[in-house]
Amino acid sequence: MKQEQLRACQPLQFDRFVHILEQGQLNHAYLFSGNFGSLEMALFLSKSLFCSEKNGIFPCEKCRNCKLIEQEEFPDVTMIKPQNQVIKTERIRELVSQFSQSGIENQYQVFIIEQAEKMHVNAANSLLKVIEEPQSEIYIFFLTNDEEQMLPTIRSRTQIFQFKKQVSTLISQLEEVGLVKNKAKLLAKFSQSQTEADKMKVSASLLGF
């Protein structure tokens, strides 16, 4: 997702993070509640850390690092996702063992945990000390669409940002690809994330919907 699309998707949160980056105050642990642009924001922030040709705090989106991060292949940005509907304790313990190490290509490391509410309780507990006392330049982004299912101890130790669904933004974007308003409203109603909306836009265009 391009930066202007992310700003349109979540203008308040985008501007807040621009200010945070400009002040050099990026926290080491965030909880992103809601999946409308949350993954895209985590990737944007990762690019801002690793981009080799930034314009101020803004990543270029074109350098090797930016492209690898977008493709989820950059070695210092680790993506964690559920397997069989659970994020196992063993996977998080492997993660914790990396926290005391420097990055491969930089001093930073970024960990993005998708559907973080699906972490086993022991897995979540194993992260508490690391969140409280990070031993290296690490940044952890917990992404969840069900904040209430996250352990209270995780919620209390992270900065929480809301990524609520922006129906009006979705409708506008769907209309931009040629959908009439009532069809745009219908697709916007059933799309649960910005990524899903983008896929729907492409499908709708190909099918002549």
Language-model segment annotations:
Residues 15-21, 89-110, 117-118, 122-130:
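Conserved alpha-helical scaffold flanking the Walker A/P-loop in AAA+ ATPase domains
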Residues 25-26, 70-74, 104-107, 134-137:
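Short loop/turn elements that form and flank the Walker-type P-loop nucleotide-binding site
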Residues 74, 92, 124, 147, ...:
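ATP/adenylate-binding site constellation spanning eukaryotic-like Ser/Thr protein kinases
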Residues 110-112, 141:
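Structural motif
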